[in-house]
Amino acid sequence: MQPAALLGLLGATVVAAVSSMPVDIRNHNEEVVTHCIIEVLSNALLKSSAPPITPECRQVLKKNGKELKNEEKSENENTRFEVRLLRDPADTSEAPGLSSREDSGEGDAQVPTVADTESGGHSRERAGEPPGSQVAKEAKTRYSKSEGQNREEEMVKYQKRERGEVGSEERLSEGPGKAQTAFLNQRNQTPAKKEELVSRYDTQSARGLEKSHSRERSSQESGEETKSQENWPQELQRHPEGQEAPGESEEDASPEVDKRHSRPRHHHGRSRPDRSSQEGNPPLEEESHVGTGNSDEEKARHPAHFRALEEGAEYGEEVRRHSAAQAPGDLQGARFGGRGRGEHQALRRPSEESLEQENKRHGLSPDLNMAQGYSEESEEERGPAPGPSYRARGGEAAAYSTLGQTDEKRFLGETHHRVQESQRDKARRRLPGELRNYLDYGEEKGEEAARGKWQPQGDPRDADENREEARLRGKQYAPHHITEKRLGELLNPFYDPSQWKSSRFERKDPMDDSFLEGEEENGLTLNEKNFFPEYNYDWWEKKPFEEDVNWGYEKRNPVPKLDLKRQYDRVAELDQLLHYRKKSAEFPDFYDSEEQMSPQHTAENEEEKAGQGVLTEEEEKELENLAAMDLELQKIAEKFSGTRRG
């Protein structure tokens, strides 16, 4: 009877509770919870062996417990934000350089702080109150979801921007990259975690439009706080220690920098830098001094976080110092925000002056200094070489000592090259003239290849004189080069000119000079040029020398070569015969004169004249053969002249 009475009493209480609830509120979760409570009680009273809680009821209770925990977390975060906003003095109206947008934003931010303080006191009472209607709840959840999506998009954009800035910092200092990347990753992960917590809190605990508005304002303030925390070491880099005159920084700096300075900084009890910039102190000093009470407590709670922040600040300061000493003028001008050139010159480091004095002591020329400046700029674009010298305290001295060593190596390399050239000149003086020309041409080819890689900054007149001398040296053998090239191309498709002959000289020589030179060497006139081709007899005397020079030519060129020597000899004989017959046809008195002929020739001629009356058949055949040979020689001569004209 007792269990039945208890069950009846329990049913009556449940019916009374359900009937007392308003009809408009249809909360499915509460109905499921009451149903689970009834089932648990009935199972415990009726069946002693049955499980006390079914798995569906357990899931429902877990969900409710999670929601309660999330609500408590969100309330704790709200109270923390409200305490920080109340702790931070609201003196934005005193700053004269702020924009109207930021004034309105901060004024709006102050209103929900009051609302948060009022609502924060009664947050415990409101947690137990039943929420509004289901339509209002759906509207709130949609609004909170859209807010969470917008915040996530903004967070992704902000992280991309931060990664771009971090990449530029890492390009300037790649040396001790591991510590910096670890610190930057830690820095990038903290705002993401905070934003995820805020978005979860928005989606799960939607309590009312008024409370969601206040929470939005507080989350915006927290986002500004995280941005100001992450921009703090970058501002340390942007504002050097020796920079004074904050009035000029307020006038010259962009409005974005002003906004960054005027944003509230909740970084472990730091105060805003607005008052410090108005009173005339640089913002770096105000940021570096931490509030005593709060900072000691926070350091005691989070020692690892503070140590990482201090190391990051020291490392950023060293990187800034090194990059300011090494960066070219345009980069530093952009970093200082459009300052005048005089002020930028005043900020030069003494290490640069010591480097210039060291260069003067070594006796380096200004051209070399200019080349060194270009190389330093290219090294900066690539990023400095990794090494421990940038992380050490004496990083500047180590970096500049390595630069000095490279300059000394360059200087020693130039002296060694000059000594080698002088030894080559001595050896060249002892060689015969033709072999010296061959060596000069090979050296010129090597110099041209080297000149394509590195142009020496010498006197251009010296280069022109050297080029002129090389051209004149090549002209000495230009005519027979042309002859050999023409004959080789005509007779052999695999013709390859010798390596020591320069087609560059033939291209660069004017046509009139080579034409007149060939005329003078052959002793021919312009009229004779039309009748027979140019021929140089000295070339056959110099041919053995060419064969000696190119003794490994067939081995170096695997292309099958025909017997060019035999063909060249045959063509030379034909050319000689043609030359003689043309001359004899044009000048019979010159070739048939008695002075040119020996007494034996005169006796033979007299005998021939005496017996010239009747020709035999053999003599007629010989004459026909000679006539045919003459025709062939004339055709060959026409081909030669045609190839020369073409």
Curated annotation (Swiss-Prot):
Chain positions found as Pyrrolidone carboxylic acid: 476, 567, 634
Residue ranges, compositional bias (Basic and acidic residues): 67-90, 119-128, 137-173, 208-228, 340-361, 406-425, 442-451, 459-472
Chain positions found as Phosphothreonine: 79, 92
Modification comment: O-glycosylated by the trisaccharide, GalNAc-Gal-NeuAc, on 2 sites in the N-terminal. May be glycated.
Compositional bias segments (type: Polar residues): 182-191
Carbohydrate attachment residues: 93, 113, 190, 222
Keyword Secreted recorded: yes
Keywords: Cleavage on pair of basic residues, Cytoplasmic vesicle, Disulfide bond, Glycoprotein, Membrane, Phosphoprotein, Proteoglycan, Pyrrolidone carboxylic acid, Secreted, Signal, Sulfation
UniProt signal peptide: 1-20
Pfam family, any one: Granin
Residues recorded with modification Phosphoserine: 74, 93, 99-100, 104, 123, 146, 168, 205, 276-277, 295, 351, 354, 375, 378, 502-503, 514, 584, 593, 598
Positions where Phosphotyrosine occurs in the chain: 374
Cysteine disulfide links: 36-57
Basic residues compositional bias, start-end: 260-270
Positions bearing Sulfotyrosine: 315, 441, 535, 591
Site, as annotated: Cleavage: 161-162, 275-276, 278-279, 324-325, 629-630
Gene Ontology CC terms: extracellular space; secretory granule; transport vesicle membrane
Role: Secretogranin-1 is a neuroendocrine secretory granule protein, which may be the precursor for other biologically active peptides. The 16 pairs of basic AA distributed throughout its sequence may be used as proteolytic cleavage sites.
Stated name of the protein: Secretogranin-1
The organism's taxonomic lineage, starting at the top: Eukaryota, Metazoa, Chordata, Craniata, Vertebrata
